[in-house]
Amino acid sequence: MSMASPFPALDGSAPVLQQFDQAPEFGIDTSKRYTATMDTSLGAMVIALDAVNAPGTVNNFVFLAAHHYYDGVVFHRIINGFMCQGGDPTGTGRGGPGYRFNDEPVKQKYQIGSLAMANAGPNTNGSQFFLISGPSGVGLPPQYNHFGQVVKGLEIVDAMQRVDTDHSDRPRTPVVINSVTISVAD
């Protein structure tokens, strides 16, 4: 029988890990409010995570952030007016944590600053996510787990979408996630 990966403490003491054998055990409390502060090479943004409507996705993101999974990872795909995609430690768009998890019903419309999971089809979520940065992203069909909203630092999302990119939408100057810190409140 497979065991889930144990859920780490949120105090920054968890080891740095980027590969796992199993998806994480459920370790968040959906009655609490979770916030992610994502510090990037362009500045910091604060993201309210939606543990009520996307508990499995928030659990996964918090688990990975607690393991410093996203530290030093780039946004590898940026399309102005659409979205900024990151969360792949290989920086290629093909990497992930070593497991996949199921989709959750999208209960709210995407808006600029929405945080959602990137996927390769139904139930293929892992570590990659995107931030909606423009009208093309707002119009996406509800097939990407929507699990957060930027509540401070939308100007960072806007600056990110405006970086110069190559023909494959890869930023010519890397946009790096320095760290993701999780806060919990009642």
Predicted regions and their residues:
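Cyclophilin-like peptidyl-prolyl cis-trans isomerases
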Residues: 1-186
